[in-house]
Amino acid sequence: MSEPEELHHPDIHTTAGKLADLRRRVQEATHAGSARAVEKQHAKGKLTARERIELLIDEGSFVELDEFAQHRSTDFGMENNRPYGDGVVTGYGMVDGRPVAVFSQDFTVFGGALGEVFGQKIMKVMDFALKTGCPVIGINDSGGARIQEGVSALGMYGEIFRRNTHASGVIPQISLVVGPCAGGAVYSPAITDFTVMVDQTSHMFITGPDVIKTVTGEDVGFEELGGARTHNAVSGVAHHMAGDEKDAIEYVKQLLSYLPSNNLSEPPVFPEEADLALTDEDRELDVIVPDSANQPYDMHAVIEHILDDAEFFETQALFAPNILTGFGRVEGHPVGIVANQPMQFAGCLDIDASEKAARFVRTCDAFNVPVITFVDVPGFLPGVDQEHTGIIRRGAKLIYAYAEATVPLITVITRKAFGGAYDVMGSKHLGADLNLAWPTAQIAVMGAQGAVNILHRRTIAAAESAGDGDATRARLIQEYEDTLLNPYTAAERGYIDAVIMPSDTRSHVVRGLRQLRTKRESLPPKKHGNIPL
């Protein structure tokens, strides 16, 4: 008998035959999708489930689980098509030498549709990740629930959501959406910590374009409704828009380098003692804030001066650009960054910015990553739409996030810190450990023009009647600025720990983080808080 025949029809009554039978089954499982389906996948610019795992996991480290799992459905002729793996590849391995668990949905098998066994495989690998304390990465490329299996498929979604919820804040959960993700399937990525999408090939929505047109009459395409750009720039559902799948996977690998394996571990550290001697680069910060309070500057430049190698790993870069969030390192230790961006809406806080920053602060707090906050905020964005859409309740999420955080918190006020926005942005009053201010800081209830209009309404009215309104207003504004628009009133009261030269910021941050590494703080015992959702 020829070798190929032995592979297809091994004598399973012998040891050699049993080994050959295993090899045959592994071969079938590895190529569960038809060649035509794989070809169509590649034609769309997409990788297969196993190709994605190969890119993500360190070479030779992947261990597959449930490779031979098969569905048990007998309806609609399903008993005649029972491929190994049931349309999802699950297992564990290493990313940059650190353990992770992973599941990768296979669109070449049943369109990646989730059935009972498919769901059980994902549940098992999630349970495995939670028990072993390692991150879980879900690669989503699925047509949704497997209709032939009915409520069994829906039940599996619910089981997965419950596991996502129980694992939240315990192990990092990252979702890669690299194809369709529709209906109930979208809620698993929504619960996870980070969601990465690929431009033009990823789509997430509860109801598709056809249903929307039937019900509401709205005519919308897949890309506009739930494409990567929509969820990165408009809805805020996603955290990064990748150019292709390789870029997406690279982003995930880099993201993992800032996160611990679980909430009981510390994030990965690459120790490198900082040279605290003043440099020309440090001195650049002394001239970064313009003389005019209304002139913007790029907060990215401030952040990059503080971080190792000026490397700022931004999250949700396209969403709520008036606030910046992301990771970096100081002396090799990961830190989270939250910063107002004067280049967008003058750095005002609005609903989107508040929720973006609140979620990021809570993620950092859950995974033991210190938070450094840079403040230049004139207040909350005024507008009827903001008020009616719930800025009070939704802005309060940022207060809640800072107030409940027990990780080291360092805040640097670079310029404006007005009104309630001053309190919200990591103030001493919410529990920040170290609050610094530049000499350019303006900490007050409001800006000079608005304050003078309220404080000196009668004086200004009388001056205007006498034809001296502009000069009087200018004099009163100058008096207000000299009296209150500075960091020293807050420093007198201990709300600011130190007023520092901008060029000394990195030095103060480095020393502060060194001291705060032994910080221990706990919250009052409770089942859980009631964040204003």
Predicted stretch roles:
Residues 1-533:
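Ligand-binding clefts of soluble mixed alpha/beta catalytic domains
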